[in-house]
C-alpha cells in the first residue's frame, strides 16, 4: 500500500514523501493517527501542486537546518550517569538526555530526531546523530562519565594455580597399598 506522509515519521520518511508500507501499518496506524493518507491518483496530483507552490519554503527550511547544523558543529557533550564499580551504567543514556545537554549549550532540538546507535550502557565516548532535515544530519560526539568517584577497570580473574604437594610418607604408603 502506498501512502503520502502528512508529517515526518521516524524510520519511515518525511512529510510529503510517498512511501510503501504494509497494509495493516497503513490502515491501522498511519491513517487513523493522521500521519498519512492513501496515495490515490487525485491525492498525488494535489501533492504535486502543493510541492510546486512550496518549493521556495522547502529551500528556506533546508537553509535553516543547515544554519542550525553549522551552529552545532564543534559541540561535544559530557553526560554524567550512575554506574557500577566496573563502569556499567545503571539503565542507559537516551536521546532525552542528549537533548537536555544540547539545550544547556543553547541548541534546542526535538528528542525524536536524535539517533543513538548502539545503545549506550557503559562509560566511554560515543556519537549521536541529529537528523535536522532529510538532507542535513549532524554527528555530536559525547562522553559518558561516572557520577561515582572511582571506577575499577574490569579484569578477568585469574584462576589460582594448584600447587603440587610433595609426596609424604603417608601418601606413598597409600599408593603402595592401592597397588
UniProtKB/Swiss-Prot annotation:
Signal peptide: none annotated. Keywords: Ribonucleoprotein, Ribosomal protein, RNA-binding, rRNA-binding. InterPro entries: Ribosomal_bL9, Ribosomal_bL9/RNase_H1_N, Ribosomal_bL9_bac/chp, Ribosomal_bL9_C, Ribosomal_bL9_C_sf, Ribosomal_bL9_N, Ribosomal_bL9_N_sf. Residues 167-179 have a biased composition (Acidic residues). Pfam families: Ribosomal_L9_C, Ribosomal_L9_N. Gene3D superfamilies: Ribosomal protein L9, C-terminal domain, Ribosomal protein L9, N-terminal domain. The keyword Ribonucleoprotein applies. One of its GO terms (cellular component) is ribonucleoprotein complex. GO terms for biological process: translation. Residues 155-179 are annotated as: Disordered. One of its GO terms (molecular function) is structural constituent of ribosome. Belongs to the bacterial ribosomal protein bL9 family. HAMAP family: Ribosomal_bL9. NCBIfam families: L9. Binds to the 23S rRNA. This is Large ribosomal subunit protein bL9. It comes from Porphyromonas gingivalis (strain ATCC BAA-308 / W83).
